[in-house]
A protein has these predicted regions:
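A short loop-to-beta-strand scaffold at the N-terminal edge of the catalytic core in hydrolase folds
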Residues: 141-153, 159-160
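Primarily recognizes the serine-hydrolase "nucleophile elbow" in alpha/beta-hydrolase
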Residues: 206, 210-277
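Conserved alpha/beta-hydrolase "acid-adjacent" motif
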Residues: 289-295
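C-terminal catalytic histidine-bearing segment of alpha/beta-hydrolase fold enzymes
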Residues: 44, 49-64, 306-358
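Short beta-strand element of the alpha/beta-hydrolase
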Residues: 158-167
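Short beta-strand/loop motif that positions the catalytic acidic residue
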Residues: 282-284
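N-terminal targeting or regulatory segments adjacent to alpha/beta-hydrolase or S9 domains
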Residues: 19-146, 355-358
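Short amphipathic alpha-helix adjacent to the substrate-entry channel of hydrolases
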Residues: 175-193
Length: 358
């Protein structure tokens, strides 16, 4: 019953962009930490990167052309997926000029750091991109050619996260809404993947379920711990994280796998919840004109009433799509989110923790 409702909701969501909003309100649950090293290869498209988290020689700068980045031979066929394949939703001849529809506070220095990290890793002969579909599957559905996982390595044997960018289910704004998160998580020692998926609510969730199945199947080669993994997402990506963590991967055509230990959700106005949902951290800005913060808070309050751990932050005045929020009142929220995730690791997802409103 609930799954049938979600499929219907997904179809509606394909027509509307939904986000979140705020005031200076927080709900807290605590946590703990880690550091980075490297992992091995799994089957899939490859290129490389080491354990330096972007500290190798700088190749690109703010004035570098996006076209040159995408065409860099070190990235092979997947360089085109660094920026949205749907051209109508972004612009910018250079890295510092990057603009993405629905997004704010795009940090050009972060963009430069990401492309240099991936370039340095690839030059170091570390695999930074994995296909999640076979050639036959791509032939049967050509849209699957525009999917895959970018891998930001942490410590070998550490837990993993899958980060899902938003884009109204019309495009994937990874350079601002998932790559930065994945890079920060890798710096903290966690293995982070950023998913490039097919636009569309249902196909996006199918791709996420397939990606998680791929990671589980290749966990030893990737060097990841599959216990209490987390799903992250902003806007449309936040819905993906909520739906797949709540319904499970099998509901979207993936393998029958354990649910995520934590969902980290930014600016998406999803309202439904149930006992099937997982511990959830959420944040949003009070100036968000796409997703209403009270809708988001009501969902977190509902989860908390069911004994599901939650943490909720509303940042005064921030609009939709602030990403990491560097230089804003939300700066550092990702540290709170990681601590929340770590708390779930410690509590083994069994302790109901009441939110604290500040």
């Amino acid at each position: 019953m609930r799954f049938n409702r979600i499929v219907f909701t997904m179809l509606l969501t394909s027509w509307f962009l939904v986000g979140c909003g705020t005031d200076k309100l927080e709900t807290l649950t605590k946590a703990e930490g880690v550091k980075p090293d490297n992992a091995a290869n799994a089957s899939g498209n490859a290129s490389s990167g080491g354990t330096n988290n972007g500290e190798a020689a700088v190749t690109y700068n703010r004035k570098s052309r996006t076209a040159d980045v995408m065409a860099d031979p070190v990235f092979g066929d997947y360089g085109r997926l660094l920026f949205p394949v749907q051209r109508g939703y972004w612009s910018g001849e250079t890295l510092e000029q990057l603009r993405l529809t629905y997004y704010n506070y795009i940090d050009p220095d972060e963009t430069v750091a990401i492309v240099n990290y991936l370039h340095n890793q690839a030059s170091d002969e570390q695999t930074v991109f994995y296909d999640i579909y076979s050639d036959d599957e791509k032939t049967a559905d050509p849209r699957k050619q525009d999917t895959g996982l970018f891998f930001f390595r942490g410590n070998r044997g550490s837990r993993f996260a899958v980060c899902n960018a938003g884009g109204a289910f019309a495009y994937v704004g990874a350079m601002h809404d998932s790559f930065p998160h994945a890079l920060e998580l890798s710096k903290k020692g966690y293995n982070a993947f950023a998913l490039i998926y097919r636009p569309g609510a249902l196909t996006a969730c199918e791709d996420l379920a397939r990606a998680i199945s791929f990671i589980f199947a290749h966990a030893d080669e990737l060097g990841v711990n599959t216990d209490c993994y987390s799903l992250w997402g902003g806007s449309a990506g936040g819905r993906m994280a909520a739906w797949v963590s709540g319904y499970g991967t099998a509901a979207f055509g993936g393998d029958n796998l354990p649910k995520a230990g934590t969902a980290v959700i930014q600016y998406t106005g999803l309202s439904e919840y149930s006992l099937d949902d997982v511990p959830t951290y959420a944040c949003v800005g009070s100036g968000d004109g796409i997703a209403y913060w009270r809708t988001m808070k009501a969902r977190l309050d509902g989860l908390s009433s069911l004994g599901i751990p939650t943490e909720f932050h509303v940042y005064e005045g921030l609009p939709h799509g602030f990403g990491l929020g560097t230089g804003t009142v939300a700066d550092g929220w990702i540290d709170d989110a990681v601590r929340f995730w770590e708390r779930q690791m410690k509590d083994n997802n069994t302790t109901g923790i009441k939110p604290i409103t500040k």
